[in-house]
Amino acid sequence: MCGNSVRENRESPQPPAGNSGPAGRAEKAKSRKLAMYGCGQSDNSTLPTKPLNKMADATAEAVEGRELTKENAGQQNMPRTQCRTKGVPSALERVRQAALRSRNERFSALFHHITTERLEVAFLKIKQDAAPGVDGVTWEQYAKDLNKNVENLHLRLQKGAYRAKPSRRAYIPKPDGRQRPLGVAALEDKMVQRAATEVLNAIYEVDFLGFSYGFRPGRQAHQALDALAIGIRFRKISWILDADVQGYFDSIDHNWMVKFMEHRVSDKRMLRLIKKWLKAGVIEDGKWTASEAGSPQGASISPLLANVYLHYVLDLWAHQWRQRHARGDVIIVRWADDFVVGFQHEEDAKRFHAALHDRFKKFSLKLHPEKTRLIRFGRFAQRDCRRIDGRNKPETFNFLGFTHCCGVNQNGKFQIRRITMKERFNAKLHGVKAELRKRMHQSIAEQAKWLGSVVRGYFQYHAIPGNWKILGAFRTQVTRMWYKTLQRRSQKSHLNWERMTKIANTVLPPARILHPWPEQRFAATIQGRSPVR
């Protein structure tokens, strides 16, 4: 969604600089890694959280999610030199400020921001158990001599001797049963890509429009879901174009990609680095294949490149189209290559759909014929679908794992109902069942610990208002599968369902709503600065 300024977004703090001292890098790598990622892998809450009691530097503004005051408590006793140092913006903050001052500014000196400290921080953010690339180097092996390895990598980057390695082709199952191809990059490629992404984000987080949410720092899927729900409810929306780009990551045109990057980046070394990653190719079954188009899905740089490509191909064009050609209200919410456009008038929706098809064709993209639909949806859909379409109820659409339906609240007013997609629900249960078979001979305590984390992570994303029945059904099904697994371990099992229920109530979290209503969270996020558009 967008407001008074469609470019308005929330900036996220820069990651802390790594320890630049020559001693202790390798020894601290593992402990710092665990400290960074000791929390769960579920989506974080978008609401501000309170700090720990012993955090001395916490302020009221930080707790409440507000901006800092000009002079915080305790700042009067701070040495004057330290005060001046804290007020000096970081190098990337100066880049961000320059990008904000001029939308036409082209940056010619970015490559030097890929420092040894930034490379080390990038290394520590990589999962220790991440699959190795074509070179077979693992996180543990690289950490044994981290200082020397990082210095050597940085030296090769500065000399121009760095060579991007091909990605190793791997496949993961999709919810529809097909296989999704992934490109597993080598460890050093991941480090450099993460560092380059951090540098480039200082520019593009200023440029990206407000209705773009996917793979952006400080933005989460639930913010996109909230923005969509608010837009449909409070704007005059009667039609929804649910769109998906077919094979997007494999269809990115390399020439157009470089041209788009050159709008903001004139640093030849940075552009050369991006070209190396695009042309590195993939290795599958020992055979190297050149990359004529696309960016490997799974590479650390790919989400940023994908967002830049659609920023120029879709976002800027769509925002201009609704300002110049739309007769009624138009809302847009995009998450990577999956986006939803809402319209007040059917003729606007049809003209936009046709123009979008031609626009994508110019840049080697194509809308997925099965996943792209134009449906009647909104506050008047229930009335019009019976009178005009002869349907008993409006159609539904899927977005970010939830099926969106037209409904009413307790007062009889229009409200969007969001429930977990049936395909996602069944796929998750199927995965839990398969994993339980592998863990059949583990102790009950070990199984309980794992299942508790699974259910907790599922609730963390899916526990939205109106989805309580799905949460309860998921917890019940997990308990039943666990019960059957324990019974299979012994033919003389004395475990009955009543006792199993008591065990489950002890170790599995109860089904309860964890997320607020979209109106509450969206209002807290924008803080009244921009209306829904």
Language model: regions and residue ranges:
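Non-catalytic terminal/accessory segments
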Residues: 1-533
